[in-house]
Amino acid sequence: MDLESESSVLESVEDNNGLIGDLDKELNSPVETSPLISKGFGLRKWKRRLRRDLVKDDTSVSMENSKALKRVLSGLVDPNAKQMHLPGPEVRQDSVGSVGSVNSVVGFVMGGESYGNGLAFAAGVDSDNSEDRSSTMSHSWDKHRGKVSGGKSVISSGDSSQQRKSSVEKSNKLRGERIKIEKENSHSSMESADSRSSNFVFMQGASYSLSSREQGGRRMMDYDDENSDHDAHTSKRKDNVEEEEEETEDYSQGDCVEESQIKSNGSSDNLDPLIVAVNSFQTLQEALQKELQKFQELGKEEPITSLHDGGESSSCIHAGHEGASEASSSYRFGSEKMGEMELTSLDSEILNLVNNVEHLEIKLEEAKRILEVKETQIRELESTINVSETCNGGTEIGIEDIFQQKVEAEIEYIIFSRSVGNLKRRIKLIEEEKTLGLSKLDKAETKAENLKNQAQDLQNHCVEITEIQEVECLKKRAFKTTRCLLLQLGLLFILYYSLLPEPEIAVPT
């Protein structure tokens, strides 16, 4: 069993040699491969045993496939192992199962890219087509830099934490870009469908997509039944993988699968049936526009008809929008019965276009009739206007004379008003001069009165001065007379005392 497991692993590695070579060129990390063991009875081809009795649901099979891919890819990103070594017998059996699960999931991814390429992709079988499969897988897995080496672990030289962070960041970026692309595609498809689609086109696209999905689902069921043995065998290895590695590998797997689906949808021959239906409807719409342009060229002389025709065409387009919304709802909630109307959709669409053209022709005729009626009304109005102009010729002359008189009166009024204004200004100046003269007279009178008062004051002062001088003279005379009298009295007393006899005084001895 050991030799058989080793030989099966080595053979699967040889089948996937192209894929491993491309990934090794990307990673630029040295990987040591285990040498060939030539002991025993030689290498035997590993064959897959199919269990037809075991049946599973689509969801369980897809979940087991994703879990198996997580476990295998988590083993591929292990940074601690630096060499490839041969494990024990139990581990070898698990590795064989893991290789089968990897190849089965790879087949699932390639089948999801286009239904025409097939869903059954098995390792160890169809060795001639292994190079083509490996090249397509390397192209789809090129951006994510998956590290695969046939069931054994491929080791990079960087740190594990940095690798995990970088892988998580890359997966998040790719997921964001994928979501943006899906939103843009959905918005663009819905806008084009709303503006240019009809019920039958969407019914055709829905039926075609449903039939293709049913076929792909049947193929996936058959392929999952074939891989059920290996999925059941590989489901026992849950406890050997950490949660972080499972999340990162899950993100990278989903992004890789969806990116490969986007690429295959852009490049494969089996295009989206909705896009094909929309393109066919665009061609039909262009043909209808050309016919409408021809009708417009025929009716260039009547512009109102073209306007009316545009209104009717806009109403038809509005009806087409409503039909597009109904078609989108039928596309979403359609059933398998829509597949029966694929062949009759184009015929019914052509009939609808013919009916629309006939309806537009009827509307054109009605618009022409309305135009004729309006032209007659316009002619009647022009005739009435001419009659009114002839009657109103004399009144216009009188109105002109009155207008001239009015203008002259206004000019005279302006002149008189200006002259009156000038006179008023002059009167104001004269009055101001009078007031200035009166103010000057008042000032002169006040000055004269002041001078008179000053003269009177001087006279009074002079009188007072003379009176004071006279009083002083009288005072001087009185002072002289009193002084003379006092001198005379003093002399008399002196003479009197000198004439008196001296008294006799007893002098003691």
Swiss-Prot record:
Q: Where is this motif: Nuclear localization signal 1?
A: 44-45
Q: Which UniProt keywords apply?
A: Coiled coil, Membrane, Nucleus, Transmembrane, Transmembrane helix
List the ranges annotated as motif Nuclear localization signal 2.
47-48
Gene Ontology cellular component?
cell plate; nuclear envelope; nuclear membrane
Q: What is its main location?
A: nucleus
What ranges does the record list as Basic and acidic residues composition bias? 166-186, 229-240
Q: Which GO terms describe its molecular function?
A: protein heterodimerization activity; protein homodimerization activity
Q: What does this protein do?
A: Mediates and enhances the nuclear envelope docking of RANGAP proteins mediated by WIT1 and WIT2 in the undifferentiated cells of root tips. As component of the SUN-WIP-WIT2-KAKU1 complex, mediates the transfer of cytoplasmic forces to the nuclear envelope (NE), leading to nuclear shape changes.
Oligomeric and partner information? Homodimer, and heterodimer with WIP1. Component of Ran complexes at least composed of WIT1 or WIT2, RANGAP1 or RANGAP2, and WIP1 or WIP2 or WIP3. Interacts with RANGAP1, RANGAP2, WIT1, WPP1/MAF1, and WPP2/MAF2. Interacts with SUN1 and SUN2. Interacts with KIN1. Core component of the LINC complex which is composed of inner nuclear membrane SUN domain-containing proteins coupled to outer nuclear membrane WIP and WIT proteins. The LINC complex also involves nucleoskeletal proteins CRWN/LINC and possibly KAKU4 and the cytoskeletal myosin KAKU1. Interacts with WIT2.
**Name of the protein this chain belongs to:** WPP domain-interacting protein 2
> Organism source for this protein?
Arabidopsis thaliana (Mouse-ear cress)
Question: Which gene does this sequence derive from?
Answer: WIP2
